[in-house]
């Protein structure tokens, strides 16, 4: 028989805050002459021989089709008049901490999803407000007045719906999805808008006739589970507005990684590979302390100009040995388009995908 929870907890009040074009907006705030112009956070490809990747860009740049993870060269081709800025990760981190301090005025139940987004559970809150919408508006006001930035907010009874709501109207939007509105809202939503559905999964879903949340709502959950494993169950639940994951201040460990910053830049590939061996040994030691193995290896490389490359590789077996981790990291490094002229200031190796092989369904 099938076993998975169909209980839908609609009692929580969850806010998802997503800073609007965060890095680019900070740069525009600090240099008002950039306002209204297409700003791209990446090194100018004319100065790097076409190298570099877009971290993010302003909404004016997005109007030209530019988006994050695009090559800087492609961004330039789409908009030659774009203003390219290398970016300042330390500054963005500082601003992110300032945003978090604003959150803390209303609740301590905060889960950072990334440097520019977070979930807040305001079911119980510090100002005794019954309305999550009121708190979301106050947060938007505080961030705009005190930091000169805008954010979009989504409000609903779970994290999945709050995240979708914050994406619905940007920039500086505020969207509420009530429990009795969730199914209708999700029914119209394209599957590619479901948080967690990647580019590789979309064509598979389309091939099966699943184009919207409504299609998934009518699906046979057994069939989804047989085709996609535990992910199929989760997708069926999400399409039906069910996502009972709590906002966690301290997340359950999902990865183990180590990073090193270098005062003296690394240039030679052999030097980088030697460092990856050292870092992999540290990661292995940490994995073994926590009795964990993972089948996803992630390499992070940051150039001297703060351009950051992140690439992952899925392995057949779960790993925890320093030799296996280092070999996987080396393979990833050799697959990236490494620019030896820039110099590397940071390297990182992370292992995730814990317990993937254990994620099986009870079907009898």
UniProtKB/Swiss-Prot annotation:
Q: How is the cofactor bound?
A: Binds 2 magnesium ions per subunit.
Q: Where is the UmuC domain?
A: 14-198
Family, according to the entry, reads as follows: Belongs to the DNA polymerase type-Y family.
Per UniProt, what is the name of the gene that codes for the protein in this document? Answer: dinB
Keyword DNA-binding, does the record have it?
A: yes
Q: What Pfam families does this protein's entry cite?
A: IMS, IMS_C, IMS_HHH
Active site (catalytic residues):
117
GO terms in the biological process aspect are: DNA-templated DNA replication; error-prone translesion synthesis; SOS response
Q: What is this protein called?
A: DNA polymerase IV
What reaction does this enzyme carry out catalytically? DNA(n) + a 2'-deoxyribonucleoside 5'-triphosphate = DNA(n+1) + diphosphate
Q: Which HAMAP family match?
A: DNApol_IV (MF_01113)
């Amino acid at each position: 028989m099938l076993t998975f929870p169909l209980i839908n907890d609609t009692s929580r009040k969850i806010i998802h805050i997503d800073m609007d074009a965060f890095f680019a907006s900070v740069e525009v705030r600090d240099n008002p002459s950039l306002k209204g112009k297409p700003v791209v956070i990446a090194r100018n490809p004319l100065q790097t021989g076409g190298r570099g990747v877009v971290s993010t860009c302003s909404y004016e740049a997005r109007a030209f089709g530019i988006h994050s993870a695009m090559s800087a060269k492609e961004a330039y081709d789409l908009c030659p008049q774009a203003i390219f800025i290398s970016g300042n990760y330390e500054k963005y981190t500082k601003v992110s901490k300032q945003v978090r301090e604003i959150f803390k005025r209303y609740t301590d139940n905060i889960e950072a999803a990334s440097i520019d987004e977070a979930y807040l559970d305001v079911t119980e809150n510090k100002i005794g407000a019954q309305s999550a919408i009121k708190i979301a508006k106050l947060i938007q006001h505080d961030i705009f007045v005190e930091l000169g930035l805008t954010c979009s907010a989504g409000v609903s009874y779970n994290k999945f719906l709050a995240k979708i709501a914050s994406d619905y109207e940007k920039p500086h939007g505020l969207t509420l999805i009530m429990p009795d509105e969730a199914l209708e809202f999700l029914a119209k939503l394209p599957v590619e808008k479901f948080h967690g559905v990647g580019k590789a999964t979309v064509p598979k879903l389309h091939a099966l006739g699943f184009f919207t949340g409504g299609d998934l709502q009518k699906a046979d959950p057994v069939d989804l589970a047989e085709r996609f494993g535990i992910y199929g169950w989760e997708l069926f639940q999400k399409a039906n507005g069910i996502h009972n994951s709590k906002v966690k201040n301290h997340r359950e460990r999902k990865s183990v990684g180590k990073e090193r910053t270098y005062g003296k830049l690394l240039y030679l590939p052999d030097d980088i590979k030697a460092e990856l061996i050292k870092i992999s040994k540290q990661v292995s030691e940490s994995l073994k302390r926590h009795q964990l193995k993972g089948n996803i290896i992630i390499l992070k490389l940051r150039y001297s100009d703060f351009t950051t490359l992140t690439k992952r590789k899925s392995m057949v077996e779960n790993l925890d040995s320093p030799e296996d981790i280092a070999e996987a990291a080396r393979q990833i490094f050799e697959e990236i388009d490494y620019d030896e002229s820039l110099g590397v200031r940071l390297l990182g190796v992370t292992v995730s995908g814990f317990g993937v092989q254990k994620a099986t369904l009870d079907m009898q």
